[in-house]
Structures are given as structure tokens and as C-alpha cells.
């Protein structure tokens, strides 16, 4: 199984590609799609869509796992990021990927074993599991790796949150 992990965003979209085969997990790539706040929103969304398509075409994942969005206060930011997330989902749908989403609590529970783990604990665990020399940077990429790991660990136990 090949998983595309996504940490949704408009300025920075974290992504990762993990392979899971014979109980072995291998990270093929992780990184970020970045857009400039100086660019018009339609241009930013178009760029994200194009870059997502390139990643999907290159790596041919089976599943796509998203971190569920959570916003506290800023409605304008929530709307803009939600629009970007819609574009990210659309690129996966157009490539016939199965879509799943996980809450931050589920991701922390799956990766660290504790749903209230802090960001640093999650990053250190990701580094250990995948035998990285250092924590993936930036944080958005590390989050995307954690999302993909959550999906892989969930698949072992048939604990998959298929997007409705």
C-alpha cells in the first residue's frame, strides 16, 4: 500500500509518500507545496492543484490521508484553508484515490500512543519509526508523515476513517 499523507494548508501544504509492504514502512518522499501570500487566491489554488497532481502522478499512491482541519477563531483563515483543502481533495478524487481523514488526537494516538502528545513527541516518534537521521522539516512535512503513519497503523487494525 502506498499512502499520500497531507497536512492541508494554503501557504504551506505538507505532503509525504510512504510505502507499507510486508510489515515494513518506507518513506519515499516528504516535503511542502508553498504559495506566496502576495499571489491572488485563485492562482494559489491552481498552483496547489497542479503540484498535487504532479506528486500523485509521480508516486501513484493508493490512499490519501488528510489531517482534519481545526480552527479556533479566525474565520477568514478557516475559509481560505478550507478552499485549499477542497482543491487538495479534488486532485485526489480526480486520480481515483481512496480518501481518509484523521483528527490530531487520532494521529497522536496512532503514532505516539498518547492522544495528548505534543508536537515534539510526535516528531521524535516519526524520526524513530522511519529511522530518519533528523526530524523532517518543516513542521508541515513532519505532520504529513505522521498522518500517513496514522493511516498505515490504522489499516493494520482496520481502523480507517474513510472520508464521507
From Swiss-Prot:
Its EC number is 3.1.21.10. The keyword Zinc does not apply. Mg(2+) 1 binds at residues 7, 140. Its cofactor is Mg(2+). It holds the Pfam family RuvC. It is found in: Cytoplasm. One of its GO terms (biological process) is DNA recombination. Homodimer which binds Holliday junction (HJ) DNA. The HJ becomes 2-fold symmetrical on binding to RuvC with unstacked arms; it has a different conformation from HJ DNA in complex with RuvA. In the full resolvosome a probable DNA-RuvA(4)-RuvB(12)-RuvC(2) complex forms which resolves the HJ. This is Crossover junction endodeoxyribonuclease RuvC. It comes from Finegoldia magna (strain ATCC 29328 / DSM 20472 / WAL 2508) (Peptostreptococcus magnus). The gene is ruvC.
Amino acid at each position: 500500500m502506498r499512502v499520500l499523507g497531507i497536512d492541508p494548508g494554503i501557504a504551506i501544504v505538507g505532503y509525504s509518500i510512504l510505502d507499507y509492504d510486508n510489515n515494513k514502512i518506507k518513506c519515499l518522499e516528504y516535503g511542502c507545496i508553498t504559495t506566496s501570500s502576495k499571489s491572488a487566491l485563485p492562482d494559489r489554488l491552481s498552483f496547489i492543484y497542479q503540484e498535487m497532481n504532479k506528486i500523485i502522478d509521480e508516486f501513484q499512491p493508493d490512499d490519501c490521508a488528510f489531517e482534519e482541519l481545526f480552527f479556533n477563531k479566525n474565520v477568514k483563515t478557516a475559509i481560505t484553508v478550507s478552499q485549499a483543502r477542497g482543491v487538495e481533495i479534488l486532485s485526489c478524487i480526480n486520480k481515483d484515490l481512496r480518501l481518509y481523514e484523521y483528527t490530531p488526537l487520532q494521529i497522536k494516538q496512532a503514532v505516539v500512543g498518547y492522544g495528548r502528545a505534543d508536537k515534539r513527541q510526535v516528531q521524535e516518534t516519526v524520526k524513530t519509526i522511519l529511522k530518519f537521521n533528523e526530524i523532517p522539516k518543516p513542521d508541515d512535512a513532519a505532520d504529513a508523515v505522521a498522518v500517513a503513519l496514522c493511516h498505515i497503523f490504522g489499516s493494520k487494525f482496520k481502523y480507517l476513517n474513510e472520508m464521507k
